[in-house]
Amino acid sequence: MGSFLKSFRKDVGSAAPSVGAPPAKKEPQPLPMTPLEKMLTELGPIRGDGSDKFYGMENFGNTCYCNSILQCLYYSVPFREAVLNYPKRTPIEDLEAALAKALRYQDPNARLEAEALAEKQKAANSPRPGQPPNPQQKPEDKDSPEYKKKLALQTLPLLETTDNSVSYGIPESLFSSLKDMFESIVGSQSRIGIIRPQHFLEVLRRENEMFRTAMHQDAHEFLNLLLNEVVVDVEKAAAKLLESPQPASDVSDSVIPSSSSGSRTPNTTRWVHELFEGLLTSETQCLTCEKASQRDEVFLDLSVDLEQHSSVTSCLRKFSAEEMLCERNKFHCDNCGGLQEAEKRMKIKRLPRILALHLKRFKYTEDLQRLQKLFHRVVYPYHLRLFNTTDDAEDPDRLYELYAVVVHIGGGPYHGHYVSIIKTQDRGWLLFDDEMVEPVDKNYVRNFFGDKPGLACAYVLFYQETTMEAVMKEQEQENTEPPVEVNASTLKQNGFSSSATLAHAHSASQVPTYEDHDRFTGLKRAPTAPQLSTHPEHTTTDSESLPSPAPDPAPLTSLPPIPPIPETPPAPLTSRKSDLQSKKERVKEEKERKAAEKEKEKQRRKEIETRLKDRQRREDDDLKAALEASKVSKEDEDRRNHAENGTSKKNAGGLGRFRSLSQRLSTKESRTSLSRIPPLPNGNHTLSKVPDESEQTHPKSPTPPAPLSRPASQPLNDDLLGSPRADTLAVPTEQEHIKNSKHDRSSHGKWRSFSLRKKSFNILSS
């Protein structure tokens, strides 16, 4: 037993390390592969066009608005090629040699040292036994975007950019710094890394005071400013290049078309206009003279108003809806020469190759006196056709595909964060969040329609032109790919579940359940998508991605009809082409039908105007006939009065019969006063009996009394009737008659004028 213990102690002593020996150096453990690295493992050699480079961009303090827009512009193939080719393309060998020192690889031991230092600080700050734990100290989540960004800065290659405007032959500007960034990414020897756009931001802040502060900026404003600045810088560079003549070899190599990308790069200074510029036509039609006037204006992006529970199609329809110009907003018509009511509408006359749609999420409210974010649900399709075009538009049936989405995360316009989801050339959809770049599935793009406050919302949509053949080819590839298994780790990679700053943007791509399938079935009727076999927004609801239930044994007998499947692919292609042709025919028929309806409406209006003019002419003729009849009746009455009373035409008129009545009364009174005159030589004829005063004062009827009867061959003695004696005798009797009959309705002036008006109206109506 003693010998055994001695030998045991001896073995233990020999196995113990010597006290003075140094500890063994810790070997650096290999980092686990990121999802992006796993995706790029099977790629071949590096391409020379930069389409297989996936670089994040370092955030220098609220510069996410800049990073998201720059990423969208870089992955636009025609825009990237145009920037690289103007004024001339730098050879790839020169780029690689110049960027050999600019690309800085990280030391893997530095990360271990940083982690060891962090662990030591954590151990020093840890509470001692018996002390309560610090509630503010939380364990770091390795799945959060912040941790992934920090890890990327410590491990991925860093790419510095410098000013190379002298080699381009143009002055330093925002365009030259943008070209520096694009050339740095294209010429780098690493597919992944982080680029530092520090020089670009310095030029931006030097030339634009609005971006000098570290405040939250608007991504759409930056896009608009960048495109306009690029246009100005390119025109200045072209003017400088014209002043300094170049050799013929340099001029011939100024634009090198890229055969790998297949994009047609413009070789003029208007390549920005040819890519992003469209033409809007404002049609205004005067409602008075029906003359239409047009005014054209260019645009680099379209800003559309939003409505709750709508789509991009409905927003564009509202954008081109008819607007009534009335009241204070009347239209000045040159044809009418004044302000008139009019109808105004906006239509697209020329479509751009790259369509940037700005969803107006920020609206000024009068109550709050500030901008407020709208969390309206707006559905956007993967493929889009614009319908609000003019009849003479160039290529009105152009098909667009969604290739980039800029997302705003936050509750208001004055704070938040911007990220971009971009469809790459052959690697699918990627999420660019400053330094972090991760692959996402196609359905992840649908998470930013925006229907709840606090969630991420799509802010700028980038559509690029495509063809129906390319869409069909892409769908065939998607149908042949095996279904991807979605597990918890995939959800962590695609979402923002544990981020402190992006926690409100939790929009991980999940496998939809059958309830989700029922909820999204209404989107199948979106009119903006092309007539394809499967709507792009519902690919996850197919049997490929949904877990299908276990089939019954009975349906297994239906398996033999499967062999004819390889013969079916050509059939849908023919039917789709025929559908496209039939759709074009339907569009043409619709245009012809609308033109026919418009012509019919115009003809109907002319007929209505003709009928109105005829009726007005008939009314004028009737009025003239009534006036002529009134004149004839007036002349007849004048002749009758003249024949009965012997009055002259001077007294004839509207009041002639009343004047003759007073004259007859005065004549009667004068004749009664001459009753003592001896009889005339012809004794056979005597004057008729003169009515008494009572009969004159109270007549039995309102009709005037009959004239005195006398022979027509025996005229009155005018000298005797006109003598002063006769006037003296007749005046008191006439005054007495007026005094006695002033209360009589038939003799009052008011009633006489009323009977006159009534008589005139009867004549006109007859």
Swiss-Prot record:
The gene is creB. Residues 576-643, 734-747 have a biased composition (Basic and acidic residues). Gene3D superfamilies: Cysteine proteinases. Residues 548-572 have a biased composition (Pro residues). Residues 573-620 form a coiled coil. It catalyses: Thiol-dependent hydrolysis of ester, thioester, amide, peptide and isopeptide bonds formed by the C-terminal Gly of ubiquitin (a 76-residue protein attached to proteins as an intracellular targeting signal). Keywords: Coiled coil, Hydrolase, Protease, Thiol protease, Ubl conjugation pathway. This is Ubiquitin carboxyl-terminal hydrolase creB. Its EC number is 3.4.19.12. GO terms for molecular function: cysteine-type deubiquitinase activity. It comes from the Eukaryota. It comes from Emericella nidulans (strain FGSC A4 / ATCC 38163 / CBS 112.46 / NRRL 194 / M139) (Aspergillus nidulans). GO terms for biological process: carbon catabolite repression of transcription; protein deubiquitination; regulation of protein stability; ubiquitin-dependent protein catabolic process. Residues 1-32, 115-145, 243-266, 526-752 are annotated as: Disordered. Interacts with creA, creC and qutD. The keyword Coiled coil applies. PANTHER family: RE52890P, UBIQUITIN CARBOXYL-TERMINAL HYDROLASE. Residues 55-466 form the USP domain. One of its GO terms (cellular component) is cytosol. Ubiquitin thioesterase component of the regulatory network controlling carbon source utilization through ubiquitination and deubiquitination involving creA, creB, creC, creD and acrB. Deubiquitinates the creA catabolic repressor and the quinate permease qutD. Also plays a role in response to carbon starvation and the control of extracellular proteases activity. Belongs to the peptidase C19 family. Residues 13-23, 249-263 have a biased composition (Low complexity). The active site is at residues 64, 417. InterPro entries: Papain-like_cys_pep_sf, Peptidase_C19, Peptidase_C19_UCH, USP_CS, USP_dom.
